[in-house]
Regions:
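Charged, non-catalytic interaction/linker regions at domain boundaries
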Residues: 2-201, 205-210, 316-347
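Amphipathic, oligomerization/interface secondary-structure segments
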Residues: 2-18, 180-347
Length: 347
């Protein structure tokens, strides 16, 4: 048997007996029976492309297998419908690699007594069927990816993050906040925005948050990155400057010798928004007052005082409106300021 497969087999049985006192040395010949085709595939045909841990004990992975790409998700996502995905059969080589690569622990069914009765039945045992092992681990579901994966590693990870955002939107078992349908639609929309400058990890964390204020803060961080850029954009347009963006920024920093003021730059940022996005937020009438409200809310959460306790009693409808407003603004603003992001990547 190939050394790689021997090591994988050993690691699988170590996982299976993780919460028991079973000594694997007492079963020196035990191994999972694999067909010749599956054996060869485990040995050479399965490649982990990218992985992402999200939520509690939730793992998403993309594998390349025999020239195709497959997405593996926990079983609760079995019913999701995403255009780029199609349901795939359970491919044993991918299942085998997925369990071991991600060190997925067995379920409570893998008690010592059960394993001794049905798996480790005799010290001389040699082969155990894959089905008799796999059933003691959490179930997962598999999809074939019909889209071509990006070449860039960061873009591959963002591709997976966007799939996870859309998957969570379609399966509310992981959601802890009462998002309304409009808000979930906004999350789905941002998952469809192919912009590798957008911090999709913040978007995914906000979707999985257990409190509205943490959901909001993660989305605010997506806007926060753009504040200085909005300041440069407004200055450039006001002064009708022909300087290249990076030269203008350096000249501004040198001339004013000061860091930007977030409250002012939040107003500059929101002045870029179109009316249909501004209309989502009914807490204030003008872009500047909307910016002031969002910035003040951020400060009240980050620098929480007893006088800010009313944040804890804000209604779900109000939070849905705020979250949806910020969500809808993110892809628009990142697209609007994309040249500044390219020219000033460290700002």
């Amino acid at each position: 048997m190939n050394r790689k497969v021997i090591d994988l087999q050993s690691n699988l049985f170590k996982l299976l007996t993780l919460r028991t006192s079973i000594q694997l040395e007492s079963f020196p010949h035990i191994k999972v029976f694999l067909s010749e085709e599956d054996y060869d595939s485990v040995r050479r045909d399965v490649t982990l492309v990218v992985q992402l841990r999200f939520g509690r004990d939730q793992i998403a992975c993309i594998y390349e297998y025999v020239g195709e790409n497959y997405l593996v998700l926990p079983s609760e996502f079995e019913e999701i419908k995403i255009p780029s995905l199609e349901a795939a059969p359970d491919l044993v080589p991918i299942q085998f690699i997925h369990l071991i690569t991600n060190q997925i622990e067995p379920t409570d069914k893998a008690s010592e007594g059960v394993l001794l009765e049905y798996v480790f039945v005799d010290p001389a045992i040699e082969f155990v069927q894959w089905e008799d092992i796999h059933k003691y681990f959490p179930l997962f579901t598999m999809f074939k990816i019909n889209d071509t994966l990006p070449e860039d590693e960061k873009e591959k990870l963002n591709f997976l993050k966007r799939l996870c955002i859309e998957s969570v939107c379609q399966n509310n078992s992981l959601l802890q906040l009462p998002f309304d349908n409009d808000t979930l639609t906004s999350y789905s929309s941002i998952a469809s925005s192919i912009d590798n400058n957008i911090p999709y990890d913040n978007v995914l964390r906000s979707l999985l948050s257990y409190h509205w204020k943490f959901c909001f803060i993660d989305l605010y961080r997506c806007q926060e990155r753009l504040l200085m850029l909005a300041w440069v954009d407004e200055f450039k347009n006001t002064m009708n400057s022909s300087l290249p963006i990076n030269e203008l920024y350096n000249a501004m920093k040198s001339r004013y010798n000061t860091e930007h003021h977030e409250d002012e730059n939040m107003r500059s940022l929101y002045r870029l928004l179109p009316q249909n996005i501004l209309d989502i937020m009914t807490k204030a009438s003008r872009p500047d007052t909307k910016a002031n409200y969002i910035y003040k809310l951020r400060n009240r959460i980050v620098h929480f005082q007893h006088s800010d306790a009313d944040i804890e009693t804000m209604k779900d409808d109000e939070w849905n409106m705020i979250v949806r407003f910020v969500l809808e603004s993110i892809p628009y603003l990142y697209n609007k300021l994309q040249n500044y992001i390219i020219e000033l990547p460290e700002v």
